[in-house]
Structures are given as C-alpha cells and as structure tokens.
Amino acid sequence: MKNIKTKLMLVGLAAVLVAMLPRMSLAYEEIIVKDGGAVRGTVKVEGKLPTLPSLQITKNKEICKDVPNESLIVGPRQGLRYAVITLEGITKGKAVERESAHELDNINCRFSPHVQAASVGQFVVLKNSDPILHTVHAVFANDQPQFNVGLYPGRVSRKPLIAAGLAKIRCEVHPWMAAYVFVTEHPYHAISDIYGEYELRDVPPGAYQLKVWHESLGTQEKRVEVKPGAMQQLDFTLSPSLGAKK
C-alpha cells in the first residue's frame, strides 16, 4: 500500500510539473516544400510619433552611458524597425534549422538585438560583453519562467527554446534593460529592418493569416494567398495614436 501511495504521489507531482511548463510544439509537421511561394512587404507608421522618454539609468553609470530607448524606432520612409511578422496557423512546411543559434548580447547595458524571432528547437546564446554582472531573465506572457541566468563579464550560456510564445527579457540588476524573443513552432517569421521591410520564403501554397506584432503599437492581421513559385506583396500600417490599423 505504501508503494502504491508513493507511486500515486509521484504521478501527481509529474502532472503538476507538466502543467507548469510552457506550451510545447506538437502540431507543426516538417516537409519538403515544392513550388513554394514567398511573401514580402513593409511595416510602416503613420500619424504623429510620440516622444520617447529617456531611460532612467540608476546603476553603474560609468559603464551604462547613452542607452537608447528602442521601444519605437522609425527609419527612412516611415519604416518601422523591430516588428515581428509571423504566419499564423501554419501546420506544415520547411524544416526548422535546429542547429541555428540566436545570439543575445549584453553590451553597453542594453540587450542586443532588441527584438528577435526564433523557432522551437533552436537555441539562444547569451553573452555578456560588459565588464559588469548582468542577468538574463526570460519570462513568457503567462509568467512562466523560461530561463534566468547570471552572466559575469565574458561568460557565455547556451539555452534551448522549448516552447512557443513571446518571451520578455529583463536584467534584474539593471531594470531599464529590455528585449523580446518571439518563439514560434515553425520557421516562418521575420523581423522588420530599419526600412520596415520583411520577407518570408519557401511558404507552401495556400491561404494564411499574416500577423505583425510590435511592442509599442500592438498587433495587426491580414489574409494572404500564397501561390506556387510567386511572390506576394503585403504591407502593414500601424498608428501610434490609434494602435494597429486594419
């Protein structure tokens, strides 16, 4: 009887631990994509741009100088930097490059890059190029911790990305530091450049929802029909005053 109770307790504990884990990738099927199409476009901003507040540097001021506020970067031709573009609901397509690692560096008391997208099964390499201690604390939107690593100067740590979702990155030593890692179950994601441009390739033909996310301007979705061997143009416009514009 005692052994049975012990086994039941262990099973219950395992169930609780599984429930606490972020959502795992089970739905995406990797195939050889034939006659794949592509989607490209721009993410732009319209309307009056807000004045971004200066970051409050409260510690290690001799090292942490001129840290920019990267929460809203608008480049030439009103292009929006650091928007995440993803295909929603895609269940099969090209393989995830699992040996591909995404680097997140601590440099001049800021995370670099500020926003990136990755796939479940890939890795993020955490670095500290500063001469001071940093931490890299990644938490998903549901507040389940992904990883929390202390990085002394010059230290490197490699962490697997095991679940899909938006991870917000913070440094517990320097509270103004922030970054985002947008993790999807598939490889169809992109980050807009300084001109607001993006591109997705080798997409299986079909109809999809294309979603754009930005930390300050919200989200927007549009339908796209991907045709065999063809390039589709799909542009987005976001407004600081009204949020995402459909």
Model-inferred region functions:
Residues 1-6:
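N-terminal secretory signal peptides that target proteins for export/translocation
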Residues 27-246:
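Extracytoplasmic copper-binding redox domains, predominantly the cupredoxin/blue-copper superfamily
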